[in-house]
Amino acid sequence: MFLFFFCDLFWLRLLLCMYYCVSRLCFIVYFNCLMLIFDFLLFCLFDLYLFVGLCLFLLLWFMLFNLYSLILYYCITYLNLYLLFCIVFLLYIAFLFLFCFLCDFFLFNNLLVGDSFMDVFFIRFLLCFLECFSLLCRCLSTFLRLFCNLLSSHFLLLMFFDFFYFIFVFFFYGVFCYFILFIFVFCFCLLFYVFLYLLDLFAAILQLFIFCNMILQLIMDFLLFLLFV
């Protein structure tokens, strides 16, 4: 009985390792294909749609892994709970980024206002960044608590590998989010101040034209006065 149990456990572990390898490979292939497709088709909206597509893909990928481990181990482990927490975290960040941060671009892109709007814009950017950072810290702290509670579990080995894997994923996820936010903020500020500079330049040229026209009108009036006198 022990021999059959050991063989059965060995094959289950082997199947799970194979599924891990295939899922990682599919994730890398999908991510690269998604980058190429959106790079050629979406242009300026590439970062936004890639972010949402990546969150949806992680959602489906984690759900498939949850179902697979549920069939193998007949229970919901700490890893499943943590993955569900990651799903909620990623979707909430996507919602926060799309509907709270980019709302300023969609609502106020046609308004010509002063520096007070820029203050509101940077305050919104700062609040959104702090909210994302606090949620990331909560996610990592929850993962550490789950990891400490898992020290005596039979799932320790896979959880240990997933610890480094999710740290790696969240690191690049944070770099990716920072890159998107920095590009949007930099482009918006650059276009805004270039537009203000062009507007000031046009106003200066218009004032110069009005001044020259007034001078020419005075000269013409003076010449007509000399002619008739």
Swiss-Prot record:
Q: What is its main location?
A: mitochondrion
State the GO CC annotations.
mitochondrial inner membrane; proton-transporting ATP synthase complex
Q: Which first-to-last residue range defines the signal peptide? A: none
Annotated membrane topology: Multi-pass membrane protein
A Gene Ontology biological process in which this protein takes part is: ATP biosynthetic process
Q: Which residues cross the membrane?
A: 24-44, 45-65, 83-103, 117-137, 143-163, 177-199, 206-228
Compartments annotated for it: namely: Mitochondrion inner membrane
Q: Carries keyword Cell membrane? A: no
Q: Which UniProt keywords are given for this protein, alphabetically ordered?
A: ATP synthesis, CF(0), Hydrogen ion transport, Ion transport, Membrane, Mitochondrion, Mitochondrion inner membrane, Transmembrane, Transmembrane helix, Transport
Q: How does it assemble?
A: F-type ATPases have 2 components, CF(1) - the catalytic core - and CF(0) - the membrane proton channel. CF(1) has five subunits: alpha(3), beta(3), gamma(1), delta(1), epsilon(1). CF(0) has three main subunits: a, b and c.
* Task of the protein: Mitochondrial membrane ATP synthase (F(1)F(0) ATP synthase or Complex V) produces ATP from ADP in the presence of a proton gradient across the membrane which is generated by electron transport complexes of the respiratory chain. F-type ATPases consist of two structural domains, F(1) - containing the extramembraneous catalytic core and F(0) - containing the membrane proton channel, linked together by a central stalk and a peripheral stalk. During catalysis, ATP synthesis in the catalytic domain of F(1) is coupled via a rotary mechanism of the central stalk subunits to proton translocation.
Q: Which family does it belong to?
A: Belongs to the ATPase A chain family.
Q: What is this protein called?
A: ATP synthase subunit a
